[in-house]
Amino acid sequence: IFKNSGFDKTTGKFRFNQKLSKDLSFDATINYVQTTREGVGTSADNGRFNMLAQILSARPTGGLRLTDEELLETAIDPEMLEDGSESLAQVNPVKQTESVTNNKRAEMWSANGALTWEIIKGLTFKTAGTYNTTNNRIDIFYKDGSKEAYRNGQKPYGRTQMGRDVRWSNNNTLTWK
């Protein structure tokens, strides 16, 4: 729907069940998910700027004062800027999507394992563990022509943010039937 946008997802799962002996069994599952999102999407500025509203309210033509090409090449509607309020109420949605690079990538690994031992008939011990790690990276760059660069004195800027979340759990269960 939007220019300069996209989504990609890759998933994988591996499951392993093995009876090691008459009384001992091992189970494991490994999951992998990678997602990549590109573009500003339907909202930017943490929801304060609604791209769909900008598309619906954008002037379709330049009218008598501008050619259509001039209107399409401006980041902010010139009539909005002429009143002196420096209002960014009407941003050109085409120019905005072309002028913002917003890439979000997330990679998640998850591993579960369990070892079950039937000590005697009716008495079972099970130890299980889970390990999860998620790596995130967000690259945002506001080029000349974006409303963010306009607010920054018409100077482009950007940022990169990376994060990692790691979780581990373990449980041991003794069951008597």
Each language-model region and where it sits:
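Outer-membrane beta-barrel architecture
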Residues: 15, 112-114, 118, 173-175
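Transmembrane beta-barrel architecture of outer membranes
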Residues: 7-13
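Outer-membrane beta-barrel channels and translocator barrels
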Residues: 21, 118-120
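An active-site-proximal structural segment forming one wall of the substrate-binding cleft
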Residues: 123
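Surface-exposed loop/interface segments of Gram-negative outer-membrane beta-barrel transport/assembly proteins
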Residues: 2, 17-108, 126-177
